[in-house]
A protein has these predicted regions:
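A cross-kingdom feature that marks ATP-driven nucleic-acid transaction machinery
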Residues: 15, 42, 315-473
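Phosphate-binding site recognition
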Residues: 1-345
Length: 473
């Protein structure tokens, strides 16, 4: 755990220490480039997922000088001048010389005896006033001709535009030594931000605040879940509130429709038709394009049951970011009440009675991630897929989904996940088993449970996983 920067949270008037946690694989990849005199890397991911911090961490022990430039939403010449100003400040260029292109700047750097680590952050901003093809061609030429003593790190938050750089038709195709799509931290890694908490509380903290390092650094593990919510997401002066209200979708051109889509999905309207009807877009046909754009931003995702992988009728959408989901479930439509009541009263009126249900749904995702980690670490074998499972119980005239299912060669392992504050009872396990056995044609392997507060009994016919096991991989 390493301190990498320091901020002052104006909300709580206390210092917030930004810690570096996780990212071992990504660090290993980027650090390997430091063994070469010349390299190029592309790092992309949604806002505040830790791209810049990762790059700076990878470069902090390099003997070569680092140059960091964050691009502006401005004409190309302004960005060239800004980049040169950074080089002057770092004493790489003696004075502010009048370069007319990025090519000329990098050609000049090639004449120097030193090796440089150069970070071009928010690369898509260079395309604000210049055609994307032109910008990409410029950097293709730079990588091909002018980085013999440069390790170039190109980073960006506009995921769709960054992905385009990897397409065969793009000028930069095949130019990067490595590329990394940086995702949110998983529940296990995030638990390092609040190590002293009980497992029951760790589940709740991740369910609400999610996997952004930027957000997790704002949390105080000495405080309760309620207190952390009040101090951050219910405080309009907090940068956490700003993250949910506008920062995450600041690059999206139709923010209002994005908000309406998030609100619909976060409040149970997860099927395409349901979202379409909720937004009144049924006759326009625009929803599909808007969902595609938000998918490209890594904010929402499509979810198919593992036994219905291409069935559009069974397709549902979910908001991937836990904190964003929380904001649109509880706060978005009630902002005026938050202003009138204050954070504590708002929590008691609008959140307190429903928060356990909210956490329970996210606990299911934690459980699926747990099994995924077990497979990746080779602690669990013979699993071909992990997800939800759609069932049609014709005998009882009902259908639904099992939320945590492992697909094996000839059967499915089915797990029920319970976020209870008390131990799970045997009677409830038996009732869950009856429901599973009632489904005709379902080949069942294991029936199991994951209970946040343990079990009254752990009979041998069931696989009973203790919540502690999720955090001891």
């Amino acid at each position: 755990m390493n301190t990498v920067s320091l901020n002052l949270d104006s909300t709580t008037k206390k210092e917030v220490i930004f810690m570096f946690i996780g990212r071992e694989e990504e660090l290993k990849i980027l650090s390997s480039l430091l063994e070469k005199p010349s390299a190029s890397a592309m790092i992309y991911g949604k806002r505040k997922v830790g791209k810049t911090t990762l790059i700076k961490k990878a470069l902090e022990n390099s003997k070569d000088k680092m140059v960091y430039y964050e691009c502006l939403k401005a004409p190309l010449q302004e960005n060239i001048d800004g980049f040169v100003a950074v080089l002057v400040r770092e004493k790489i260029i003696p004075v502010q010389l009048a370069f007319k292109s990025f090519n000329d700047v990098f050609a000049y750097l090639n004449t120097l005896d030193s090796t440089f680590n150069i970070v071009i952050d928010e690369y898509p901003y260079l395309k604000t006033f210049t055609t994307p093809e032109t910008v990409d061609s410029i950097f293709q030429s730079i990588i091909d001709n002018h980085i013999t003593n440069v390790r170039l790190f190109v980073s960006g938050s506009h995921i769709g535009m960054m992905k385009d750089l990897l397409e065969e038709k793009n000028a930069l195709y095949g130019r990067f030594t490595v590329f990394i799509c940086l995702k949110e931290l998983d529940y296990l890694t995030c638990s390092e931000f609040y190590r002293s908490k009980s497992v029951y509380d760790k589940i709740a903290m991740y369910a609400v605040f999610g996997g952004s390092p930027y957000i997790n650094c704002a949390l105080d593990e000495r405080l309760s879940l309620k207190e952390n919510i009040i101090n951050t997401i219910l405080n309009p002066s907090s940068y956490v509130y700003g993250y949910t209200e506008h920062l995450l979708i600041s690059d999206y051109t139709n923010a209002l429709n994005a908000e309406r889509i998030f609100f619909a999905i976060s409040n149970g309207h997860q099927k395409y038709k349901e979202i379409e009807e909720k937004l009144g877009l049924k006759t326009t046909g625009n929803l599909s394009k808007q969902i595609d754009a938000l998918e490209n931003m890594d904010i929402i995702s499509r979810v198919y049951p593992i036994n219905k992988p291409n069935d559009k009728k069974k397709l549902s959408f979910e908001v991937k970011d836990n904190l964003l989901r929380f904001y649109y479930a509880f706060i978005y439509k009630n902002k005026s009440a938050l202003q009138m009541l204050g954070a504590e009263a708002f929590y008691e009126e609008y959140i307190e009675d429903s928060i356990v249900t909210f956490i329970s749904h996210r606990f299911e995702e934690i459980a699926r991630t747990y099994f995924s980690l077990c497979v990746k670490k080779r602690k669990l074998r013979g699993v071909s897929n992990i997800g939800t499972f759609y069932y049609d119980d014709s005998a009882n005239k009902k259908n639904g989904e099992f939320d945590v299912v492992l697909e094996r060669k000839n059967a499915y392992d089915i797990y029920e996940v319970k976020y209870y504050s008390v131990p799970m009872r045997l009677k409830e396990m038996q009732e869950e088993e009856r429901q599973v056995r009632a489904i005709k044609g379902l080949q069942v392997g294991t029936i199991g449970f994951i209970a946040a507060s343990g079990y009254e009994e752990m009979p041998g016919e069931y696989t009973c996983i203790l919540a502690d096991e999720l955090y001891n991989l």
